[in-house]
């Protein structure tokens, strides 16, 4: 499933795929207080400009990342933050997601796209049926009900600082991770 409309994103999400904030506004306030998220984007109450401390929380790889933090060209191709909360566990896999590795036998499941049903996968190697999020997706797919999407970030172009993930865990009592979504 593709819940995102952006081509490439860094996505931060809770390790428990069933977790959602009791109050979504608390998540927004936490991100704004930390300076990761800034002002709301126009009428959308789930999208934000990056905050004043965005670059303190996200580390860019390489010596010269080419990111736009403002919509200078009015084309919508710039880095902003979007929060997505769903009622059911959502699988976010792009066409660039690699074969995940089985949590039991550790072998790759090459036919995962055909086998993924109701967020379950059965390994063709060992025949073990598992929740899909237990497979090792190598940070190229994720499952959950709550996602913090940082748009216009390509795979391995940037990563969240551990201090940001620790702050989210301290605020909400659940550990957080990240993955890259690339349509």
Language-model-detected regions and their locations in the chain:
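Cys/His-rich short segments
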Residues: 81-140
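A composition-biased, non-transmembrane "mature-region" signal
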Residues: 31-37, 117, 122, 162, ...
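His-enriched metal-coordination microenvironments in redox/metal-binding proteins
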Residues: 1-9, 114-118, 142
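Long, charge-rich boundary regions
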Residues: 131-183
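N-terminal alpha-helical interaction blocks
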Residues: 1-89
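Ampiphathic alpha-helical segments that act as solvent-exposed interaction surfaces
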Residues: 20-37, 86, 95-104, 108, ...
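A structural detector for beta-sheet-dominated domains
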Residues: 70, 99-101, 151
């Amino acid at each position: 499933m593709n819940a995102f409309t952006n081509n490439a994103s860094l996505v931060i999400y809770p390790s428990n795929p069933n977790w959602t904030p009791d109050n979504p506004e608390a998540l927004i306030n936490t991100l704004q207080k930390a300076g990761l998220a800034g002002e709301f984007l126009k009428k959308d109450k789930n999208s934000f400009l990056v905050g004043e401390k965005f670059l303190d929380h996200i580390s860019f790889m390489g010596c010269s990342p080419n990111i736009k933090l403002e919509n200078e060209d009015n084309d919508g191709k710039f880095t902003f933050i979007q929060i997505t909360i769903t009622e059911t566990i959502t699988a976010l896999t792009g066409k660039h997601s690699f074969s995940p590795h089985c949590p039991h036998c550790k072998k790759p499941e090459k036919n995962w796209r055909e086998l993924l049903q109701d967020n379950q996968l059965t390994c063709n190697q060992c025949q073990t049926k598992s929740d899909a999020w237990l497979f090792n997706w190598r940070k190229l797919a994720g499952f959950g009900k709550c996602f913090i999407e940082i748009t216009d970030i390509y795979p391995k172009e940037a990563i969240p600082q551990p201090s940001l993930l620790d702050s989210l865990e301290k605020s909400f009592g659940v550990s957080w991770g990240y993955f890259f979504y690339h349509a």
